[in-house]
Protein backbone atom coordinates (compact mmCIF):
# COMPACT_ATOMS: atom_id res chain seq x y z
CA UNK A 1 0.00 0.00 0.00
CA UNK A 2 -0.64 2.44 -1.62
CA UNK A 3 -1.82 0.33 -4.55
CA UNK A 4 -3.66 1.01 -7.80
CA UNK A 5 -4.12 3.90 -10.15
CA UNK A 6 -2.00 5.23 -12.97
CA UNK A 7 1.01 5.61 -10.66
CA UNK A 8 1.86 4.75 -7.05
CA UNK A 9 -0.17 7.00 -4.74
CA UNK A 10 -2.59 8.12 -7.47
CA UNK A 11 -5.34 9.87 -5.42
CA UNK A 12 -8.06 9.01 -7.97
CA UNK A 13 -8.07 5.23 -7.56
CA UNK A 14 -7.62 2.64 -4.83
CA UNK A 15 -5.78 4.10 -1.81
CA UNK A 16 -3.61 7.11 -1.02
CA UNK A 17 -0.95 8.01 1.56
CA UNK A 18 -1.04 11.75 2.28
CA UNK A 19 2.62 12.59 1.81
CA UNK A 20 1.97 15.95 0.17
CA UNK A 21 4.18 17.37 2.94
CA UNK A 22 7.19 15.94 1.04
CA UNK A 23 5.79 15.13 -2.44
CA UNK A 24 3.74 17.10 -4.93
CA UNK A 25 1.14 15.34 -7.05
CA UNK A 26 -2.15 16.19 -8.80
CA UNK A 27 -5.79 15.28 -8.02
CA UNK A 28 -5.34 15.35 -4.24
CA UNK A 29 -8.29 17.55 -3.22
CA UNK A 30 -10.80 14.70 -2.87
CA UNK A 31 -8.85 11.42 -2.86
CA UNK A 32 -10.67 8.14 -3.37
CA UNK A 33 -9.55 6.54 -0.08
CA UNK A 34 -6.93 7.70 2.43
CA UNK A 35 -5.27 4.58 3.81
CA UNK A 36 -2.60 6.53 5.70
CA UNK A 37 -2.81 10.13 6.83
CA UNK A 38 0.41 11.23 8.43
CA UNK A 39 2.07 14.32 9.83
CA UNK A 40 4.59 14.46 12.66
CA UNK A 41 4.69 16.33 15.96
CA UNK A 42 6.15 15.77 19.44
CA UNK A 43 3.95 14.52 22.30
CA UNK A 44 2.86 16.60 25.28
CA UNK A 45 5.68 18.18 27.26
CA UNK A 46 5.65 15.78 30.23
CA UNK A 47 5.91 12.82 27.83
CA UNK A 48 8.65 14.51 25.80
CA UNK A 49 10.69 15.16 28.95
CA UNK A 50 10.66 11.42 29.71
CA UNK A 51 11.91 10.28 26.31
CA UNK A 52 14.68 12.74 25.43
CA UNK A 53 18.22 12.80 26.75
CA UNK A 54 19.50 16.20 27.78
CA UNK A 55 17.82 19.59 27.81
CA UNK A 56 14.38 20.13 26.34
CA UNK A 57 15.65 23.52 25.08
CA UNK A 58 19.44 23.22 24.63
CA UNK A 59 21.68 26.25 25.00
CA UNK A 60 22.13 28.01 21.68
CA UNK A 61 18.92 26.69 20.13
CA UNK A 62 16.69 29.62 19.15
CA UNK A 63 13.76 28.03 17.33
CA UNK A 64 14.49 30.17 14.27
CA UNK A 65 14.56 28.59 10.83
CA UNK A 66 17.50 30.01 8.88
CA UNK A 67 19.21 28.97 5.66
CA UNK A 68 21.82 27.02 7.59
CA UNK A 69 19.32 25.35 9.97
CA UNK A 70 19.25 21.56 9.82
CA UNK A 71 16.00 20.96 11.67
CA UNK A 72 13.10 22.83 13.20
CA UNK A 73 13.51 20.79 16.41
CA UNK A 74 16.46 20.73 18.83
CA UNK A 75 18.92 17.88 18.34
CA UNK A 76 17.74 16.31 21.61
CA UNK A 77 14.28 15.96 20.04
CA UNK A 78 15.52 14.83 16.63
CA UNK A 79 17.39 11.95 18.30
CA UNK A 80 13.97 10.57 19.23
CA UNK A 81 12.42 11.23 15.83
CA UNK A 82 11.81 8.52 13.22
CA UNK A 83 14.82 9.69 11.20
CA UNK A 84 14.90 6.76 8.76
CA UNK A 85 11.34 7.66 7.70
CA UNK A 86 12.26 11.37 7.42
CA UNK A 87 9.97 12.16 10.31
CA UNK A 88 11.50 15.61 10.75
CA UNK A 89 10.26 16.54 7.24
CA UNK A 90 6.68 15.32 7.62
CA UNK A 91 5.41 18.14 9.80
CA UNK A 92 2.31 20.16 9.16
CA UNK A 93 2.61 23.75 7.93
CA UNK A 94 4.34 25.02 11.08
CA UNK A 95 5.40 28.24 9.31
CA UNK A 96 1.77 29.42 9.55
CA UNK A 97 2.22 29.77 13.33
CA UNK A 98 4.31 32.18 15.39
CA UNK A 99 8.03 31.49 15.84
CA UNK A 100 8.93 29.63 19.02
CA UNK A 101 10.77 31.32 21.89
CA UNK A 102 10.75 28.25 24.14
CA UNK A 103 9.87 24.56 24.24
CA UNK A 104 6.18 25.14 24.94
CA UNK A 105 5.90 27.44 21.93
CA UNK A 106 7.55 24.88 19.66
CA UNK A 107 5.37 22.05 20.97
CA UNK A 108 2.31 24.15 20.21
CA UNK A 109 3.61 25.22 16.79
CA UNK A 110 4.17 21.63 15.63
CA UNK A 111 1.10 20.20 17.36
CA UNK A 112 -1.23 22.88 16.00
CA UNK A 113 0.15 22.37 12.49
CA UNK A 114 -0.53 18.62 12.72
CA UNK A 115 -4.01 19.27 14.13
CA UNK A 116 -4.82 21.64 11.30
CA UNK A 117 -3.89 18.98 8.73
CA UNK A 118 -6.06 16.39 10.47
CA UNK A 119 -8.96 18.80 10.34
CA UNK A 120 -8.38 19.71 6.69
CA UNK A 121 -8.28 16.14 5.42
CA UNK A 122 -10.93 14.89 7.84
CA UNK A 123 -13.44 17.51 6.77
CA UNK A 124 -12.79 16.78 3.09
CA UNK A 125 -13.56 13.11 3.65
CA UNK A 126 -16.64 13.83 5.76
CA UNK A 127 -18.02 16.25 3.15
CA UNK A 128 -17.21 13.75 0.42
CA UNK A 129 -16.89 15.99 -2.64
CA UNK A 130 -17.46 19.46 -3.96
CA UNK A 131 -20.04 17.76 -6.21
CA UNK A 132 -21.92 15.49 -3.77
CA UNK A 133 -24.33 14.29 -6.43
CA UNK A 134 -21.47 12.56 -8.30
CA UNK A 135 -20.77 9.51 -6.11
CA UNK A 136 -17.79 8.36 -8.20
CA UNK A 137 -15.92 11.53 -7.15
CA UNK A 138 -16.54 11.20 -3.42
CA UNK A 139 -13.83 10.47 -0.87
CA UNK A 140 -14.75 7.11 0.61
CA UNK A 141 -12.62 6.62 3.69
CA UNK A 142 -9.80 7.67 6.02
CA UNK A 143 -7.26 5.86 8.21
CA UNK A 144 -5.33 7.99 10.71
CA UNK A 145 -1.71 6.95 10.92
CA UNK A 146 -1.21 6.26 13.58
CA UNK A 147 -3.37 6.14 16.66
CA UNK A 148 -0.95 4.91 19.37
CA UNK A 149 2.86 4.80 19.67
CA UNK A 150 4.30 1.41 20.59
CA UNK A 151 7.72 2.94 21.28
CA UNK A 152 8.66 6.27 22.91
CA UNK A 153 9.50 8.51 19.97
CA UNK A 154 8.60 11.69 18.09
CA UNK A 155 6.68 10.76 15.00
CA UNK A 156 3.05 10.60 13.90
CA UNK A 157 0.98 9.03 16.70
CA UNK A 158 -2.11 10.80 18.03
CA UNK A 159 -1.66 9.06 21.41
CA UNK A 160 1.91 8.78 22.67
CA UNK A 161 3.71 5.81 24.25
CA UNK A 162 2.56 6.91 27.73
CA UNK A 163 -1.11 7.02 26.62
CA UNK A 164 -1.23 10.82 26.58
CA UNK A 165 -3.13 12.73 23.89
CA UNK A 166 -2.05 16.09 22.49
CA UNK A 167 -3.55 18.41 19.86
CA UNK A 168 -3.59 15.72 17.11
CA UNK A 169 -5.65 13.33 19.28
CA UNK A 170 -8.32 15.88 20.16
CA UNK A 171 -8.39 17.22 16.57
CA UNK A 172 -9.01 13.67 15.34
CA UNK A 173 -11.73 13.14 17.93
CA UNK A 174 -13.55 16.35 16.94
CA UNK A 175 -13.38 15.94 13.18
CA UNK A 176 -14.76 12.40 13.37
CA UNK A 177 -17.47 13.06 15.92
CA UNK A 178 -20.79 11.78 14.49
CA UNK A 179 -22.25 15.25 13.87
CA UNK A 180 -20.02 17.86 12.23
CA UNK A 181 -20.27 21.46 11.07
CA UNK A 182 -17.48 22.70 8.82
CA UNK A 183 -16.64 25.43 6.34
CA UNK A 184 -15.46 24.52 2.85
CA UNK A 185 -13.22 27.33 1.57
CA UNK A 186 -12.70 27.05 -2.16
CA UNK A 187 -14.15 29.28 -4.90
CA UNK A 188 -16.72 30.35 -2.32
CA UNK A 189 -17.20 29.65 1.38
CA UNK A 190 -19.85 27.03 2.04
CA UNK A 191 -21.12 25.79 5.39
CA UNK A 192 -21.69 22.03 5.55
CA UNK A 193 -23.46 19.80 8.01
CA UNK A 194 -22.56 16.11 8.28
CA UNK A 195 -24.65 13.56 10.16
CA UNK A 196 -23.11 10.14 10.77
CA UNK A 197 -25.06 9.60 13.98
CA UNK A 198 -27.73 6.93 14.41
CA UNK A 199 -30.68 9.27 13.84
CA UNK A 200 -31.93 12.21 11.78
CA UNK A 201 -31.16 15.66 13.16
CA UNK A 202 -33.19 18.86 13.16
CA UNK A 203 -32.04 22.17 14.54
CA UNK A 204 -31.23 25.83 14.03
CA UNK A 205 -27.83 27.06 12.87
CA UNK A 206 -26.57 30.56 13.61
CA UNK A 207 -23.52 31.40 11.53
CA UNK A 208 -21.51 34.34 10.35
CA UNK A 209 -18.33 36.38 10.70
CA UNK A 210 -16.80 37.53 14.00
CA UNK A 211 -13.97 40.01 14.56
CA UNK A 212 -11.40 38.28 16.76
CA UNK A 213 -10.18 41.32 18.71
CA UNK A 214 -13.37 43.36 19.13
CA UNK A 215 -15.61 40.32 19.53
CA UNK A 216 -18.24 41.95 17.35
CA UNK A 217 -20.28 39.95 14.87
CA UNK A 218 -19.80 41.55 11.45
CA UNK A 219 -22.39 39.52 9.55
CA UNK A 220 -24.76 36.78 10.65
CA UNK A 221 -27.55 34.51 9.49
CA UNK A 222 -29.88 31.95 11.06
CA UNK A 223 -31.39 28.94 9.34
CA UNK A 224 -33.46 25.86 10.17
CA UNK A 225 -31.62 22.71 9.12
CA UNK A 226 -32.31 19.02 8.65
CA UNK A 227 -29.67 16.36 8.11
CA UNK A 228 -30.75 12.79 7.49
CA UNK A 229 -28.81 10.00 9.16
CA UNK A 230 -25.77 9.17 7.02
CA UNK A 231 -25.95 12.33 4.90
CA UNK A 232 -23.91 15.49 4.35
CA UNK A 233 -25.69 18.69 3.33
CA UNK A 234 -24.75 22.20 2.26
CA UNK A 235 -26.32 24.51 4.84
CA UNK A 236 -25.54 27.69 2.91
CA UNK A 237 -23.18 29.38 0.49
CA UNK A 238 -21.72 32.50 2.09
CA UNK A 239 -20.97 34.31 -1.19
CA UNK A 240 -23.55 36.97 -0.32
CA UNK A 241 -21.34 37.98 2.62
CA UNK A 242 -19.07 39.33 -0.14
CA UNK A 243 -15.70 40.57 1.20
CA UNK A 244 -14.60 40.94 4.81
CA UNK A 245 -11.42 41.51 6.81
CA UNK A 246 -9.13 38.55 7.38
CA UNK A 247 -8.80 39.36 11.08
CA UNK A 248 -12.23 37.77 11.44
CA UNK A 249 -13.23 34.15 11.97
CA UNK A 250 -16.07 32.12 10.53
CA UNK A 251 -18.40 30.67 13.15
CA UNK A 252 -21.44 28.41 13.22
CA UNK A 253 -23.51 27.18 16.17
CA UNK A 254 -26.03 24.35 15.84
CA UNK A 255 -28.80 24.23 18.46
CA UNK A 256 -30.31 20.76 18.17
CA UNK A 257 -34.00 20.08 18.72
CA UNK A 258 -33.21 16.82 20.53
CA UNK A 259 -31.64 18.74 23.41
CA UNK A 260 -28.07 17.57 22.82
CA UNK A 261 -25.30 20.08 23.59
CA UNK A 262 -24.92 22.85 21.00
CA UNK A 263 -22.27 22.19 18.36
CA UNK A 264 -19.79 25.01 17.69
CA UNK A 265 -17.56 25.39 14.63
CA UNK A 266 -14.85 28.07 14.34
CA UNK A 267 -12.58 28.46 11.32
CA UNK A 268 -10.06 30.95 9.96
CA UNK A 269 -9.46 32.72 6.66
CA UNK A 270 -5.84 33.70 7.40
CA UNK A 271 -2.83 31.99 8.94
CA UNK A 272 -2.34 32.30 12.69
CA UNK A 273 0.89 34.30 12.63
CA UNK A 274 -0.95 37.13 10.83
CA UNK A 275 -3.53 37.43 13.61
CA UNK A 276 -3.65 39.04 17.05
CA UNK A 277 -5.62 37.35 19.80
CA UNK A 278 -7.13 38.95 22.92
CA UNK A 279 -6.76 37.67 26.47
CA UNK A 280 -10.07 35.85 26.93
CA UNK A 281 -10.50 36.28 30.72
CA UNK A 282 -11.54 32.69 31.38
CA UNK A 283 -13.78 31.72 34.28
CA UNK A 284 -13.80 28.18 35.70
CA UNK A 285 -16.27 26.20 37.78
CA UNK A 286 -16.83 22.54 38.57
CA UNK A 287 -20.18 20.76 38.41
CA UNK A 288 -19.43 17.27 39.67
CA UNK A 289 -17.01 15.73 37.18
CA UNK A 290 -17.58 18.45 34.60
CA UNK A 291 -15.35 21.46 34.16
CA UNK A 292 -17.31 24.49 32.98
CA UNK A 293 -15.29 27.13 31.12
CA UNK A 294 -16.62 30.56 30.20
CA UNK A 295 -14.72 32.91 27.88
CA UNK A 296 -15.39 36.63 28.09
CA UNK A 297 -13.54 37.23 24.81
CA UNK A 298 -12.41 35.08 21.90
CA UNK A 299 -10.07 32.32 23.07
CA UNK A 300 -7.51 30.59 20.86
CA UNK A 301 -6.70 26.97 21.73
CA UNK A 302 -7.92 26.35 25.27
CA UNK A 303 -5.49 23.91 26.91
CA UNK A 304 -6.54 21.84 29.93
CA UNK A 305 -3.93 19.99 31.98
CA UNK A 306 -4.04 18.32 35.37
CA UNK A 307 -1.63 17.54 38.17
CA UNK A 308 -1.92 15.27 41.21
CA UNK A 309 0.93 15.64 43.68
CA UNK A 310 3.34 16.42 40.85
CA UNK A 311 2.03 13.70 38.51
CA UNK A 312 0.80 15.12 35.19
CA UNK A 313 0.02 11.76 33.57
CA UNK A 314 -3.35 10.03 33.39
CA UNK A 315 -5.69 12.99 32.82
CA UNK A 316 -8.24 12.72 30.02
CA UNK A 317 -11.02 15.04 28.90
CA UNK A 318 -13.94 14.87 26.48
CA UNK A 319 -12.42 17.82 24.63
CA UNK A 320 -9.24 19.86 24.75
CA UNK A 321 -7.22 22.31 22.63
CA UNK A 322 -10.34 24.04 21.28
CA UNK A 323 -11.30 27.64 20.44
CA UNK A 324 -14.11 29.52 22.16
CA UNK A 325 -16.40 32.35 21.06
CA UNK A 326 -16.95 35.44 23.24
CA UNK A 327 -19.52 34.62 25.91
CA UNK A 328 -19.42 30.89 25.16
CA UNK A 329 -19.88 28.47 28.06
CA UNK A 330 -18.39 25.02 27.46
CA UNK A 331 -18.73 21.87 29.55
CA UNK A 332 -15.85 19.37 29.52
CA UNK A 333 -16.12 16.01 31.29
CA UNK A 334 -13.12 14.93 33.36
CA UNK A 335 -12.18 11.37 32.50
CA UNK A 336 -8.93 9.53 33.19
CA UNK A 337 -7.89 7.77 36.38
CA UNK A 338 -7.31 10.69 38.75
CA UNK A 339 -9.42 11.01 41.89
CA UNK A 340 -8.23 14.50 42.82
CA UNK A 341 -5.74 17.17 41.85
CA UNK A 342 -5.47 20.60 40.30
CA UNK A 343 -6.74 21.51 36.85
CA UNK A 344 -4.96 24.22 34.86
CA UNK A 345 -6.71 26.01 31.99
CA UNK A 346 -5.17 28.55 29.63
CA UNK A 347 -5.57 29.82 26.12
CA UNK A 348 -2.54 29.93 23.85
CA UNK A 349 -2.38 33.72 24.13
CA UNK A 350 -3.79 34.24 27.63
CA UNK A 351 -2.94 33.66 31.27
CA UNK A 352 -3.48 30.41 33.16
CA UNK A 353 -6.32 29.72 35.62
CA UNK A 354 -6.47 26.83 38.09
CA UNK A 355 -9.13 25.04 40.11
CA UNK A 356 -8.97 22.22 42.67
CA UNK A 357 -10.73 18.99 41.72
CA UNK A 358 -12.06 15.99 43.65
CA UNK A 359 -13.88 13.28 41.70
CA UNK A 360 -17.57 13.02 42.48
CA UNK A 361 -17.75 16.23 44.51
CA UNK A 362 -20.95 18.19 43.84
What residue ranges belong to the model's regions?
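Short, well-ordered beta-strand segments enriched in hydrophobic/aromatic residues
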Residues: 189-193, 290-295
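Long, low-complexity ectodomains and other extracytoplasmic segments of secretory-pathway proteins
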Residues: 165, 175-182, 186, 261-287
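In a subset of proteins, long, contiguous C-terminal domains/tails are tracked
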Residues: 121, 138, 159-166, 175, ...
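Terminal connector regions
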Residues: 238-280, 337-362
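Substrate-binding clefts and catalytic carboxylate motifs of secreted carbohydrate-active enzymes
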Residues: 17-201
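Intrinsically disordered, low-complexity Pro/Gly/Ser/Thr-rich segments with frequent PxxP/GP/PP motifs
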Residues: 206-246, 312-338
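Active-site neighborhood of glycoside hydrolase catalytic domains
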Residues: 1-3, 163
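Short acidic, flexible loop segments centered on an aromatic residue
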Residues: 197-215, 295-313
Amino acid sequence: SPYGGEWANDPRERDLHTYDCVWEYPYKSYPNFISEHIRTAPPVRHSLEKIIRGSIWPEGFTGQILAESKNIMPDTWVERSHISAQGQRKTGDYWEFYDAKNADDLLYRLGAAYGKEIRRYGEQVRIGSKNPEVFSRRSKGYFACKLVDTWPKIYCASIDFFQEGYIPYYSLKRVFSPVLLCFQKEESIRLWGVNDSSKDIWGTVQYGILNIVSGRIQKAKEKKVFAAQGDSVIVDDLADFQFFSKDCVLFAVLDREDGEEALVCIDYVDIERHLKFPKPNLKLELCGDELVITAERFARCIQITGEQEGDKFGWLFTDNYFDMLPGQRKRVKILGNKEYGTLYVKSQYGCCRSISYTRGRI
